[in-house]
Amino acid sequence: MVPLRRPRLLLLATLVGCVTPAPAPPPVAQPPPGYTPPPGYAYPPQPYPAPYAQPAPQPVPGPAPAPLPAPQPLPAAPSNRPLLGALVGPQAWQAETRAVLDELKANLSPDKQQLVAGIPLTFDPDPGDVNAFAGCDDQGAPFIAGTEGLLEAIDAIAQTKATDELFGTRTYDAYTAAVTPGLVSSPGARAILPAGIIPAQYWSDPRRISRAHEIFDETVGFTFGHELSHHYLGHTGCAHGQPAGVPPVASDFNRFITSAIPTLNQWNEAAADQAGVNNLLDAGKARSATAYRWNEEGGLWLFDFFARLDGASGSTGIVSFTRTHPNPAIRIPVLQADAAGWRFLHPG
């Protein structure tokens, strides 16, 4: 589960700075410390155009230099990776998340599919809460839930990371510096992307829009794949393959979260991280012939976001989640190791 409600801030509870002037040309955005991106196609960073300069005086002719090697062409987007459209607003985010979750379920082993096939996904429209969790309702039926605040955060991560990857900007740093202080101190704060973080000239670039869509999908894929695994791993104790039930109403979410907290522990969270990323990588491999191949990067950036929140919180309530959940900074290398283990067993 990924709660982040002030003053009680939890991270992925059954899931889960400052802006500095960029030199010209701006540096390429860097991944979390120690992270080596998985192999695969990535858009090359695009430098800003060089300023116009007057031609230099002609040099005195000399011996002709040896010819330089022919430049290597930039990698082209594979034919199976079409440009994707924009995901705008809660309805689009929710529909996309449901589609991703269905794809994850389809790539589970048959025994796990049977346990979770009918589990509903529901959303709390509260934008002030950043949270996702798996639970059981009052009738003992399983469900998975997420909040609008979580989808706002994932969209902002996707929008900024796509921009940085393509254009060498630092919009993710600017975004986290802008929102983390409020999220850990103000009940009215939201994780939505503030206006002006992404430069206007990049906003409508179709490559940026498509890349943001891909990052959104693999981030919600890890997030809700983690939640789904709490059911088929038996952590909730209520997923037995029963027919789909009616998901709980949003007003009951706080009560369900509170009642679930005593059962949460670091072993379950670590197991769900591993199962969730394995499911995501299985689905990514299965779709790679026709679409973008999902990987663990979305989970890594989500953990990085919560690690920055942890750093911004100081002595406030967010630190308390480490009593029942692995520290997000620790989860980054563990998730990397989980993904490396999957690749060792699934070469190619």
List where the protein language model places each region:
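Bacterial Sec signal peptide processing site at the extreme N-terminus
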Residues: C18-P39
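C-terminal capping/extension segments of zinc metalloprotease domains
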Residues: V19-P21, P38, G62-F143, T147-E152, ...
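Sec-dependent bacterial lipoprotein signal peptides
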Residues: M1-V16
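A short, mixed-charge helix-start or loop-turn motif at secondary-structure junctions
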Residues: S210, E214, N254-I261
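Short alpha-helix carrying the canonical HExxH Zn2+-binding catalytic motif
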Residues: I215-S229
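A structural motif
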Residues: S186-Y202, H231-T258
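Active-site scaffold of zinc-dependent metalloenzymes
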Residues: G135-D217, G234
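Composition-driven detector of proline- and glycine-rich
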Residues: G34-P55
